[in-house]
Amino acid sequence: MPTWSSMTGGVTIRPLRTGEQWLLTEFLYEAVWRPDGAPPVPRTVLQEPVLRRYVEEFGRAADDRCLAAVCDGRVAGAVWVRRMHGFGHVDDATPELAIALYPEYRGRGIGTLLLRAMLELLRQEGCTQVSLSVQRENRAAAWYLREGCELLAERDGELVMVCRLD
């Protein structure tokens, strides 16, 4: 993976480093959406095979990609893609995207920086599209649409979107 780094407003976007893969499990937990006021989801949900595939052995496949946002010396969030049969699967050639931030870093534009950086990285590598899924009630659904993603399908309350990169 080429070295890629950007700094905007005190936020550094860089590739996830060797030894930081454990953070993806933390961010996967943060990516599990729950309505405002709902109790926290038990961490045991991360043992479900449908979720484990988002992080298990991440980095072993040649096309696994992850960018981290660093604020004040701490990894505040991450965006990662891999080809898999996840909630947002559209075809075997399209990688699926996941993104999450720790709660205290949300609403500051860091997610937008991460998403745009990953889309640009994929574009540079010749990828033509990336998919994702988001629950219909999640505020992030409107954000993805504003960022140029297109609604492709709805499956059991999950919106499947595609961001075209060509």
Where would I find each of the regions flagged by the language model?
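Conserved acetyl-CoA-binding loop-helix of GNAT-fold acetyltransferases
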Residues: 98, 107-120, 124, 145-146
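A short beta-loop-alpha structural element at the N-terminal edge
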Residues: 11-26
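Conserved GNAT acetyl-CoA-binding A-motif
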Residues: 122-135
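Acetyl-CoA-dependent GNAT
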Residues: 32-34, 41-93, 98-102
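Conserved acetyl-CoA-binding loop of GNAT-fold acetyltransferases
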Residues: 145-155
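Short glycine/proline-centered loop/turn elements that form peptide/ligand docking sites
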Residues: 111, 115, 137-140, 157-162
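Hydrophobic adenine-recognition pocket in adenosine-nucleotide-binding enzymes
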Residues: 16, 99-101, 134
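Short acidic N-proximal helix/loop "leader" segments that mark the beginning
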Residues: 1-8
